[in-house]
Amino acid sequence: MTILRKSHPLMKMVNHAFIDLPAPSNISGWWNFGSLLGLCLIIQIASGLFLDMHYTSDTLTAFSSVAHICRDVNYGWLIRYIHANGASLFFVCLYLHIGRGIYYGSYSYKETWNIGIILLFLTMATAFMGYVLPWGQMSFWGATVITNLLSAIPYIGTDLVEWIWGGFSVDKATLNRFFAFHFILPFIIAAMAMVHLLFLHETGSNNPLGIPSNCDKIPFHPYYTTKDFLGIVLLLTFFFTMVPFFPDLLGDPDNYSPANPLNTPPHIKPEWYFLFAYAILRSIPNKLGGVIALILSILILALLPHIQTASQRSLMFRPISQFLFWLLVSDVLVLTWIGGQPVEPPFIIIGQIASLSYFTIILVLMPIAGINENKMLKW
């Protein structure tokens, strides 16, 4: 078996990626989220495929087809809730994965980091289009509001929005194309994840100390396969406790009403995992300014390798930067809360302060902290 593992063209690729891969001996549980994201993607593709067999992408029947899946299809309710909550689980793992990358300086691997940012954009696009498909009230109005943001682009904005809609409003053509893209994008994400791994294995994994670990590597199997398996068991235990008992915990009650273009919900908001970006969008009174801030709230991650001023890579021995990192985490949580609140005082001013803090911490305070820590450590 060993000879086949090292000689067969396909087995050899798997062997180099998951069995004989040299890995640092000290990576912690925070490095588990890559494999957990792979598991989430598999769950989403598998459950989505079964939902696709019963779903119809037509404005007249989309809502009732989802109801049909839940009521008439064998275990259809379970598949639907696995898919809906699987998206939330995907984003939990994704944000923790990004947080670990920021804390331990993994953004120094620029190619891997940039592919990761592209993966984040693709995942967000997929989730947004998936939210539109049940054709409930929040699906329809969310699609209308978010796609309408493109009209802020000078000169071509209005034409671009109508081109995306396939008409003068969100309608059957919009639902059809969103369904098509929602189906194909996860496979593109899977392909990009392979590229992400390819670049990662070129450099090797980072470690909590942020120092080269070439002198102290261990094989990925059995050490980290066992560790990943433990993470998978814990994740699935949590997930399959949540799905049957609290399936609608993270959903919006408005989406249980069929889409009605004549009745606007009192508060239009996206799913919880977009609320921090939505709060940043709303905090700027100007439409174009809000759209630019929304895009920059994600694109700012691409700047991290270029604004790194500290000589040490990891935050493990940098207390000032550690404090700023946890301040940033708290700020994102505040933005998430604000994004779910109505646009009225005091939420408006809190959102504006939190949005300003988000960009200030990343662009100003963290680089200054890095310079000061270099002086303190005499590096």
From Swiss-Prot:
A ubiquinone binds at residue 201. Disulfide bonds: none annotated. The chain crosses the membrane at residues 33-53, 77-98, 113-133, 178-198, 226-246, 288-308, 320-340, 347-367. InterPro entries: Cyt_b/b6_C, Cyt_b/b6_C_sf, Cyt_b/b6_N, Cytb/b6-like_sf, Cytochrome_b, Cytochrome_b_C_euk/bac, Cytochrome_b_N_euk/bac, Di-haem_cyt_TM. SUPFAM superfamilies: a domain/subunit of cytochrome bc1 complex (Ubiquinol-cytochrome c reductase), Transmembrane di-heme cytochromes. GO terms for molecular function: metal ion binding; ubiquinol-cytochrome-c reductase activity. Keywords: Electron transport, Heme, Iron, Membrane, Metal-binding, Mitochondrion, Mitochondrion inner membrane, Respiratory chain, Transmembrane, Transmembrane helix, Transport, Ubiquinone. GO terms for cellular component: mitochondrial inner membrane; respiratory chain complex III. Binds 2 heme b groups non-covalently. Pfam families: Cytochrom_B_C, Cytochrome_B. Heme b b562 binds at residues 83, 182. It comes from the Eukaryota. Heme b b566 binds at residues 97, 196. Its cofactor is heme b. Coiled coil: none annotated. GO terms for biological process: mitochondrial electron transport, ubiquinol to cytochrome c. Component of the ubiquinol-cytochrome c reductase complex (complex III or cytochrome b-c1 complex) that is part of the mitochondrial respiratory chain. The b-c1 complex mediates electron transfer from ubiquinol to cytochrome c. Contributes to the generation of a proton gradient across the mitochondrial membrane that is then used for ATP synthesis. Belongs to the cytochrome b family. The cytochrome bc1 complex contains 11 subunits: 3 respiratory subunits (MT-CYB, CYC1 and UQCRFS1), 2 core proteins (UQCRC1 and UQCRC2) and 6 low-molecular weight proteins (UQCRH/QCR6, UQCRB/QCR7, UQCRQ/QCR8, UQCR10/QCR9, UQCR11/QCR10 and a cleavage product of UQCRFS1). This cytochrome bc1 complex then forms a dimer. This is Cytochrome b. It comes from Dipodomys nelsoni. The gene is MT-CYB.
